[in-house]
Structure formats: C-alpha cells, structure tokens
Amino acid sequence: AFNEKSFNPPREKAVRAIAGGQSDTAIKILTDYLKSKPNDPEARIFLNNLTVKDPYYTIAVSMPISSNMEGSLEVLRGVAHAQSDWNYSRLDDGGGMLKIAIANDDDNDSNNGTQIAQEVATELAKRKEILGVVGHYSSDVSMATINIYEENKLVSISPVSTSVDLTKRTP
C-alpha cells in the first residue's frame, strides 16, 4: 500500500492472501478489483507477478511513493503496462517472463531522501534475483545510488532523472 490515504481493502486482502500462500484467492481478488480500478498499477503488478511462470527475470522499481505518490504512480503504471505486454508476448514461446519488485525510496530531501534511497539500493543489491532497477525519481537520488548499482553490477534506468552527470556515467 502506498500510504494511509490509499488504503484499499480489496488490494490489502489480496496481499494477505499472497502472504498466506493463497495465490488462487489473491488472483481472484485482484482480477475482480481491477475490473473496477484498471489503473491501479500496484494491483496490476501483483496480479502479473502471480501469473508469472518459470523461467522469469526480476527487476525492481524504486520510487518515492510516500512523498510523491502521483509521480510514482505514473512510473508504476508504465512499468505495469510494459510487464503485462512483455509477459503476454512470452506465453507461447516459453521465454523469460518478468516479475517486478516495488520499493519505496521516499526521496524527499527534507526526509534524508538520499540516505533512504542508498539503503534501499543496498538492500536491492543483496537480492541476487534482481537484475536491474528502474528509478529513482530525482537526479540527486539517482546520483547517490549509482555507485551501489555499479559495484553490484545492477543495471539502473532512471526515466525521470534529467542530470547529464548520469548520462556521463553510462558505458
């Protein structure tokens, strides 16, 4: 869940079902919920993740969900759409599908944003199944995390960051 304002009983019920190992129940809840709220990217990603089959690849999306919900939702909508398209195209050929991990880096500078993002980046780097990261929302935060990703050989794509210094770091 993004924050208290976005508390969503059906989505939360699905999360509890996932945590309890009740994938079929979660799929039904999320499918029904998305009929009325098709633009909820978090629910869409959860549903997509539940239907992924082996082999699959995992990427993370790290956004300041707590401090910039609207911007984060827009990025997550794009990721959810790309995940849906990619996975659908892999149904018949057995190619690698895509799972998405969502991380909240809360890059609000008044809330030690770069420090939080560095902690998130460090945790993502420890998860060997994660091959890359989409994020972060601001150039300052992307610059603060780039060394962590480089040292751990993680691909990092920052679609909203505009710093030319990031471009200079690209191989």
Question: Model features per residue range: what roles?
Answer:
Residues 2-54:
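Alpha-helical protein-protein interaction scaffolds
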Residues 130-171:
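Extracytoplasmic ligand/sensor domains, especially the bilobed periplasmic-binding protein
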Residues 102-114, 139, 160-163:
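Hinge/beta->alpha junction and helix N-cap segments in small-molecule ligand-binding domains
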Residues 76, 80-100:
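Signal peptide-proximal N-terminal region
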Residues 111-131:
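Short, well-structured alpha-helical segments in soluble
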Residues 54-78, 83-85:
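Short beta-strand segments enriched in small/hydrophobic residues
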Residues 38, 54-56, 74, 95-97, ...:
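Extracytoplasmic
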Residues 13-19, 63-70, 101-109, 130-136, ...:
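Second-shell loop/turn segments in exported
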